[in-house]
Amino acid sequence: MVLKKFLAVFLSLVIFVMVIAPISAIAKDTCDCDEVPIIYVRGRSPIYLDKDDPNSHEIPVFSEEFIKKAAKELVPVYTKGYLTDDFSEFKTLLTQYMAELCKDYMLDKNGEVPNNSGQKACEYWKNVPLTDIHKTSNDVSTANGAHDELYKYFYQYDSRVDPCETADDLHEYIQAVKKVTGHSRVKLLGRCLGTIILSAYLAEYGWEDVDDVVLYNSICFGTEVNNSLFNGELYFDADGVDYFATQNLGDSLLFTLLKEIITLSNKLNGLDMTMDYFNKTGTRVAKYVIHDVMRACYGTFPAYWAMVSADRFEEARDYIFAGVEDEYAGLIQKINHYYETVGSKLTSMYKQM
């Protein structure tokens, strides 16, 4: 009888502790302010040759020397192909140049990082404890203040790898922010490639930890540039080439001169003639060349595959990996998984917001 009474009391105490302890913990950790912490997931981040070396350089390196050498060899080979209607030499040479340029940057055939390239900042929050800085402490009416406020909880990631794997890491980061701030939910702001990471996260983990989501410069539904490139489609437009050169070429003497020549040529309609020359064979050559080139660079990035819209994904996959499906089985499995669990369900998922 005494034993039964003892067990009854003991079990009652155990149950009491099991019920009260979590409640006490929640009460202790919960912040009662109205400022829900914001986690910022931006777009592409720099990739360094050796993420553990603070003196490492960013890759790939588009040096003047490399571009001059490539142009010197590729232009006559393309012209030869145009005259002979045989672009096999051009395809081989262009693929070799891209492989050389991206040898330390590209992923392997399983879509995994094969070396120590990356960004050390992605691991900071795991090694240095987060602090509670979620309450507004900057003048957000100024550009600098708004910037500092936004970057308080700044999630960084390798912009090449599988978005679904990154989403798992983001989930851990969200839990860490919740714990240190005392809030049960967070706000998520995604920009550019970051909108793909948020989409993968929401598809896997839902809205339980999320108070609100903002998609800025969203590309999670795909981009025309990626749709065309991953399907071997290429068209040269004079205004587009002029704009690209102005925005992306450097400020060295060579590049400055090149930009001025391109802009002047465009104004005099000379660039249109050059583009017409390329477009006469460009469509056919692009389809013949691009799949090999893409497998030597950006085509190995699962995250970049996520920028292909759902309605063009299967066509792109079958084009890029035609004849080498077994060789790239690991990578194909990753991009198929994203398409099946995230990409093909984006419209219905966001309609439920």
Language-model-detected regions and their locations in the chain:
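Sec-dependent signal peptide cleavage junction
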Residues: 19-32
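Bacterial N-terminal signal peptides that target proteins for export
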Residues: 1-10
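Hydrophobic core
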Residues: 11-19
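Helical cap/lid subdomain of alpha/beta-hydrolase-fold lipid enzymes
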Residues: 43-103, 108-109, 218-353
